[in-house]
Amino acid sequence: MIKKVFILALLMLNSMLCWGENSAERTKRNFLQLGLTMYEAEDIRILPTAEIKFRDLFEAVEKAEKYILLDYFKFQQDSICGVLIERLKRKVQEGVEVRIIFDSFGNHDSDFPLSDTLQARIRESGIEIVAFDPVRFPWINHLMHRNHHKIAIIDGKTVYTGGMNVADYYLHGKPKVGKWRDMQIRMSGPIVQAYEELFWKMWGKTAPSPLPLWGSASKPQHSYEEEKALPQRVSVEGAVASRWPGESPGIMRQTYVICIDNAEHLVQIVNPYAMLFGEVRAALRRALQRGVRVQFMVSTKSDGKVNDDVIGLEMRKLMKRGAEVYYFEDGFHHSKIMMIDSLFCTVGTTNLDARSLCFDYEVNAFIFSPATTHQLQQIFYNDMEKSSTLLTPEVWQERFPPRRRIRGRIYSIAKRFL
């Protein structure tokens, strides 16, 4: 009897503690239950444009002392890539080790793919560069699981990640869509370890050369006495979710659903390929049913007509259920961000389509920081007020005539493979 009362008391206490949690605290607890690790993240900076991102990255490259690790879906053979490669060559001459991974399919799909000749010259300079999983006929099954990462790591101390590849169109746009909007996040501290471990895992899968013997972010960068002498940095908690086919195939769907299900007041999402289906769509509907305010931003113009028509149908469904849908007009918004209750956010590589959620290698940082979240919200509100159109039934009727609706319904049949 006493044992039963004790167990009942523990259950009641646990319920009371959970009742007092906010959405961020519940999400962290759910992430730990999911098997994710919570890391300290320091010196977080949102890089809201390509100009700021590449300038910041180039400065970090110049300061590198040991190694530079780059893992990108696309390395386009153009001017910004040329500038980066020349800087990397100089660092190799200074004794810094440089390794690059790029996706083979992403390269072939590029406007200006890296040529074999340029790759050979890069290797001759001392930079190790490898293509992830080359697509060779007839093994077309390799098309399904692509390396969609966008990661740069400097000395195991700093990581850059987000939606940007290495390509000129992030700076100058494309004729079809105009400006190409995107953003990155830069972080320091123990959270870099998660990205470096992911890089070496990908390198081991891709490259024949051995892993390095030198230290990584998993080891202290300074002694205890040196740490005491360093300026104190503000740190927050963060988690890193990495989709790896065959090992963690559902992790992106699970983390997004957890965040949305825990939202109490506000869900804000910017995503370029929001061909919603399954668990994520159901989570958004549940949030709306709970009275949570949902604000979703997509682009009027994107780099695919198929995407636009399917996304239009999904956005109409959300609008009819009470969501605020904003169409970004000033180019193509390629960012992949989400903010929950002004308390925490995610920045990463994941699109809300089948490729990212069910097939590709992806990685997202979940940052439990109101300050960082507010920075993203300010960008969101600025875009909403100055560069967006609120979707209404009248706007939808005007933008989606019958031919687009029919086309969208036909394409929706195959959206689990788009």
PLM region spans:
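Charged, low-complexity intrinsically disordered terminal segments
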Residues: 15-418
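Sec-dependent N-terminal signal peptides
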Residues: 5-13
